[in-house]
């Protein structure tokens, strides 16, 4: 649906879909990641322990080197209503522009509680540092079974700049309890697992 309507990641200058198998979907071939996509739920924290899965995905992304052609790389969950033009607007901020491609680059934090996984945004320089110094995050991966916590702490370990962006994500887990109304100027809204609900949300956001 998103591909047919040219919405979500298909509004970006480039896009790829990652899966555990090669498939042809709407004219697009998925990129196969050689990993088991099954993971367990931590019964105490009630969080999904998926770091190993997303480490494999990020490694595949880095190895393909497509990210080098773009100023920003975005990992967006399928059930996120993602509006790329809004992100493009926010990253024009002079501070973000200055830090994105200098030094160790920049990543965008989407919640005051810490990074949440529905949308993750890294500058090209941050991707370069992540690629070059990948092994420095192995200890973090072993200690942090949740992929968003892993990525945040990996970025910190690598000395990559952070920018807190309050309008990056609207979701219940970050105290946006009315996210489902799809109001305001957020870049992404999450979650919308039903196709009809996803489309209603996207339509409510207008032509951004």
Where are these regions (language model features)?
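Short, acidic, metal-binding catalytic loop of nucleotide-sugar glycosyltransferases
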Residues: 1-13
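Conserved nucleotide-sugar donor-binding
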Residues: 50, 54-59, 83-85, 115-135
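Conserved donor-nucleotide/metal-binding helix-loop-beta segment in metal-dependent transferases, i.e.
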Residues: 65, 80-114
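A recurrent flexible, glycine/aromatic-enriched loop bordering the glycosyltransferase active site
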Residues: 72, 107-122, 136-145
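C-terminal catalytic/acceptor-binding lobe
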Residues: 141-208
């Amino acid at each position: 649906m998103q591909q047919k309507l040219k919405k979500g990641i298909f509004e970006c200058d480039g896009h790829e879909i990652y899966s555990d198998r090669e498939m042809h979907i709407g004219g697009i071939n998925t990129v196969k990641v050689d990993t088991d996509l099954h993971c367990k739920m931590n019964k105490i924290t009630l969080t999904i322990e998926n770091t190993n899965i997303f480490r494999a995905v990020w490694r595949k992304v880095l190895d393909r080197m497509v990210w080098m052609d773009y100023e920003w790389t975005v990992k967006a969950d399928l059930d996120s209503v993602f509006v790329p033009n809004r992100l493009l607007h926010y990253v024009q901020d002079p501070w973000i522009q200055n830090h994105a491609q200098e030094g160790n680059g920049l990543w965008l934090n989407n919640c005051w509680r810490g990074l949440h996984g529905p949308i993750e945004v890294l500058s090209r320089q941050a991707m370069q540092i992540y690629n070059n110094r990948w092994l420095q995050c192995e200890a973090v991966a072993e200690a942090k079974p949740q992929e968003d916590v892993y990525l945040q702490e990996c970025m910190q370990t690598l000395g990559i700049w952070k920018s807190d962006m309050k309008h990056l994500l609207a979701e219940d887990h970050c105290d946006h309890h009315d996210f489902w109304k799809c109001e305001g100027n957020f870049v992404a809204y999450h979650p919308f697992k039903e196709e009809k609900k996803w489309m209603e949300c996207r339509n409510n956001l207008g032509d951004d």
